[in-house]
């Protein structure tokens, strides 16, 4: 039997190579900077210096960028270099104001000159960040990534695209595009377009002046609704598409007429208090920037205000008049130019123009649980008919429209990023905000019943940690000359509101947890409630849910980890508890927590500095040498005093996501040991089942474990015990060993789901699936170091190719990558950038004589690192291998260098788990079911090849000579029929005959010819009960 051959590079990539060592590209970049962008001499020198430092990376990665051509790779690299020097060079040193104003280099200018669109730029930017990171760090300091703001820019761009579409939809719901009374509608269309543009520019002014730092999706939506209210009362009535007398949209009325703001809040799930504050700020902008005189609407007589309740409304008499509209547009344009001239970001005005080349087709979300959670393809898999049915929402949603047409009979609306965010924000507003901002009496009883009263400690910790996550800055700190002085005040109000929401949620869930733990341990919860890590994890989780609700741009996960001093492995210990103990948590937030756990398991816990390595070094001592050599151990957790000092020091101006200094060794506090080694868990079997509640892949993994123990769950405090402490559950294990076993079981389950998805896409046999899964498990247990600093999908992809080669399948790496791109969790950097430490690779059999660390493509990783390490395992899996003969890991294979290291009595390699199918959606009998055609582009993502036969698509008949409408009618008749499916059998009816077992057996015998059983076993009739 032959070993798996190394893959040929030419069958996986285009045969295009760089014809020089980068010198010609450097010359072309110089010409591009001078001729296309007209850079000044200083900026041009900075750009050329950075290009010179990174040109070797361009040469090495041409084939992995875009379509693999030199031209496209260069255009992307040029844009990355220029964007970097714009964002980093100016922040790295003090530059005179006149020098800044002369640069005029914006991302839009860069992209247009490079002939790239926004989607292309953000698709390839992460690869540049990974490859050029060390160089950028040397040139611009260790916090270069925070200064670059690439993730924030990406999330902001996604939000703007969503908001522009949302604004267009709501605008068209209230205003017509043509006038039926005018023969030539071209001028009318232009006028409406100007009103539409005016609203967007006023919204951007609101973002710049009032929402300065925290441009979250919920706040921006409130801003758009406030702009809509201004347009409704100012745009001439002849352009309205609604009739205020019969429109179902204006449901809030008083004796004085329609309450406009209350009706809009009811329509779009916004807070009336927040909307009134925002519209007041918008009115101030109109007065200050456009120099319009505000008037009380109650004192104005105009057609636009008829039948509206005018109390609390402000009116500007000539705001939308034909004579003043062009000048108002010009003033708003100039104000935006002045306020955003030097930030180097995108020109947000372009989002109003869908035909702009920069908005060319392409997904801004990079195929995963994307930035800020805006686009989650996995949600479509778990809920193809995802609808908003929150019990907090009114019984009838007046915002239910089809193609902009109001429908009072439709109780649900299809979920969009904006509607989902607003519904989730309503939960915070109505369920969490009314709670007290201090521990409840019940929680106080638990806190005071500890060995000492820790109430003041809990309150102080919460204040410090939440201040670190939601920092405030002094009034006027971020105000620019000529801007309104309300921006910073708005930031502080926003931060204070978010702190309160997170604090109240923390106290609420903590009280519920204590109540549940007390049932297991009694009332003495000292060990849990005095654990510093536990409380920080709870606060971080509370804050993350608040951030996820508001869809913030400037504090993207894992910002909460950095600011609280915990690691991804720490946070994973409380995710399940939040889902379990906060029963009112909206579905979207449950999914968010599940998606976080997926991210933690797939890559974050494997990164350098993860506390998982501290537990792994205790559980698997043979791996400690490699862990220490690579410097993977987590630093001790920072003290509260250190965090508090950082807050005070940073009050003069806090960057969006500051990098916390490396922790220094600290003494133990609150029972938390000085050692950073991760806490672990007890009661191994029960906890494995309990932890599976928060599955890695949202709802699909909620039932992965077949263990349904009836025992009480283990106490939560055991999850935060010292790693070296013996496991009270017995078996001679330490808590670290138990915790790592539970962690590995989660990794295996996540791997099983992803392997199954790839097998479906590639249409491979079940035997291949079993072999890939078996290899993945063996690598995790015997060659754990292959996962260090890597993404688990990188190992899975290599497993597929290795098994394909050993099984002599005609499957190329190109095919594997092509199908992986269609997976919901796909990120291009997974197969483009794999971490390699060459000293480790040489010890594992690599023939490369390189030194140091770098990131290479996955094919090079397969050839140089993966195959030399796992050849023995592949031989066992191949035909005639030892896997089928012995499924216990041989202890004789253990080495002292940390590889093939396994504890005595290693677990058996389990067969592929039984993954549950997608459960059907439960629909209330009082609601209709709405269906729409499924586009072919989405069908591939939702339905695998082997399961397409299970689905009936709208437009295809399920019976001969039937139309789709008749099929749907038949379905409705069955759902709504009054026939009882279940009921008692009537044995009293004289016409009912009893059928004996022998009669059934004889019938089956006759139908099958000679045997009633396919297996040849005789039928055994049951004897009647006596």
UniProtKB/Swiss-Prot annotation:
Gene3D superfamilies assigned: 1.10.472.140, Cyclin-like
Keywords: Cell cycle, Nucleus, Repressor, Transcription, Transcription regulation
Source species, domain of life: Eukaryota
Molecular function as annotated in GO: RNA polymerase II transcription regulatory region sequence-specific DNA binding
Region Domain A, residue ranges: 416-616
Region (Domain B), start-end ranges: 738-872
Any matching Pfam family: DUF3452
UniProt keyword Thylakoid, yes or no: no
Family: Belongs to the retinoblastoma protein (RB) family.
Protein name in the entry: Retinoblastoma-related protein 1
